[in-house]
């Protein structure tokens, strides 16, 4: 399988000079790093080339790396039923730089790109209707960014007296905790069930006889 994926990476890189910035085969999967300006060209090639025929778009999603200058990855997953293989495309961008929409190539990307915009604030040029998909119309911020507060900015509830949904400032019943979202250790719990029974000493073997 790895040989097939390496051959596919070489084929795409040779056909699209300059569009493929890097490739990686790991765990039986091929990932191509793509120049954002070339994503539509790459998607079209992968769909139409006889050696590819990636006709199915599985997903488009965002990933947030706050410490990076270009903090977002836009990740595309495509499937070729003809070749029985999947491919992953990645492009890097920031909060202000839009990525070309691939809706003209894969119409099914429409809601995927809207979700990435809603959850991360990633912008897509050429999208037919780039608006929020999962959050409310007046929602403030993008909830899957790692610097988005876990409490949110407002509470939403139904007021029976007013007979409508109302928005109120968040009320915290305990002191606010500043979550260090860049630390790999924040929130890690190493105490496992049964650890409280351990004495810290190795068990004593039973006496013979």
Curated annotation (Swiss-Prot):
Broad class of enzyme this protein falls into: translocase
Entry keyword set: Cell inner membrane, Cell membrane, Membrane, NAD, Quinone, Translocase, Transport, Ubiquinone
Stretches of the chain forming a coiled coil according to its record: none
Entry annotated with the keyword Cell inner membrane: yes
Cellular localisation: Cell inner membrane
Gene Ontology terms: cellular component: plasma membrane
A GO molecular function held by the record: NADH dehydrogenase (ubiquinone) activity
Keyword Zinc: no
Transmembrane segments: none
Entry's EC annotation: 7.1.1.-
Catalysed reactions listed for this entry: a quinone + NADH + 5 H(+)(in) = a quinol + NAD(+) + 4 H(+)(out)
Similarity comment: family membership: Belongs to the complex I 30 kDa subunit family.
Name of the protein: NADH-quinone oxidoreductase subunit C
Source species: Xanthobacter autotrophicus (strain ATCC BAA-1158 / Py2)
Organism classification: Bacteria, Pseudomonadati, Pseudomonadota, Alphaproteobacteria, Hyphomicrobiales
């Amino acid at each position: 399988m790895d040989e097939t994926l390496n051959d596919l990476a070489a084929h795409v890189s040779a056909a699209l000079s300059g569009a493929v910035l890097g490739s990686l085969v790991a765990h039986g999967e091929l990932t191509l790093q793509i120049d954002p300006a070339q994503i539509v060209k790459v998607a079209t090639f992968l769909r139409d080339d006889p050696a590819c025929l990636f006709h199915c778009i599985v997903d488009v999603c965002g990933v947030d790396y706050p410490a990076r200058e270009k903090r977002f990855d836009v990740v595309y997953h495509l499937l070729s039923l003809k070749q029985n293989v999947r491919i992953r495309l990645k492009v890097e961008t920031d909060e202000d730089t839009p990525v070309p929409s691939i809706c003209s190539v894969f119409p099914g990307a429409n809601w995927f790109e809207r979700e990435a915009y809603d959850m991360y604030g990633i912008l897509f040029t050429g999208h037919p209707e780039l608006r929020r998909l999962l959050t409310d119309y007046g929602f403030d911020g993008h909830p899957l960014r790692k610097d988005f507060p876990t409490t949110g900015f407002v509470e939403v509830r139904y007021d029976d007296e007013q007979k409508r949904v109302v928005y109120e400032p968040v009320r915290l019943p305990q002191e606010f905790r500043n979550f260090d979202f860049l630390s790999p250790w924040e929130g890690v719990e190493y105490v496992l069930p049964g650890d409280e029974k351990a004495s810290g000493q190795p068990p004593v073997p039973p006496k013979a006889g």
